[in-house]
Amino acid sequence: MARANEIKRGMVVNYNDKLLLVKDIDVQSPSARGASTLYKMRFSDVRTGLKVEERFKGDDILDTITLTRRTVTFSYIDGDEYVFMDDEDYTPYLFKKDQIEEELLFIPEGGMPGIQVLSWDGQIIALELPQTVDLEIVDTAPGIKGASASARNKPATMSTGLTIPVPEYLSAGEKIRIHIPERRYMGRAD
């Protein structure tokens, strides 16, 4: 059991007899005094895959489910299924493309370290990515010299198809670090 203000992205809650995976949380603080903060949560139903949206007050109690986490590595694509191998015992985990469509935007061609498979009671629930990823810019407007002083951004498409705003001074071919939960540019990759 946890209060709504303690729920984080990637957790699973049991709500209305449904297992719901938390995909996103928006915090809304009302301007009136004494009013409680609202948490608008977007879920994915674990059993059906449907998207669910609910609102909670900060002190509402939710039933959280403890998940098993296994570190995996992207292995190969088999038709419309993506296969990830367990790093310890080499167990294959299969995901359909539509199950992990969002996550695929952040996984580069050679894979990335830190990917975890979330399971509960032997059932595979989701794929969890690390907080950051380094991706290469493949398409953007040409870089402008001396634009580092301005805070203006331009859209850039990464090697995986993801499009995010980046500073004007960056150009195609550069590797950048992206904060996955917020889909934002953090800096140049090392």
Swiss-Prot record:
A Gene Ontology annotation in the biological process aspect, one of them, is: peptide biosynthetic process
| InterPro entries xref list | Elong-fact-P_C, NA-bd_OB-fold, Rib_uL2_dom2, Transl_elong_fac_P/YeiP, Transl_elong_KOW-like, Transl_elong_p-like_YeiP, Transl_elong_P/YeiP_cen, Transl_elong_P/YeiP_CS
GO terms of molecular function: translation elongation factor activity
Q: Which GO terms describe its cellular component?
A: cytoplasm
* Listed PROSITE patterns: EFP (PS01275)
Against Pfam families, the record matches this protein to: EFP, EFP_N, Elong-fact-P_C
SUPFAM superfamilies, sorted: Nucleic acid-binding proteins, Translation proteins SH3-like domain
Q: What family does the database annotate?
A: Belongs to the elongation factor P family.
- This protein is called what? Elongation factor P-like protein
Species of the source? Pectobacterium carotovorum subsp. carotovorum (strain PC1)
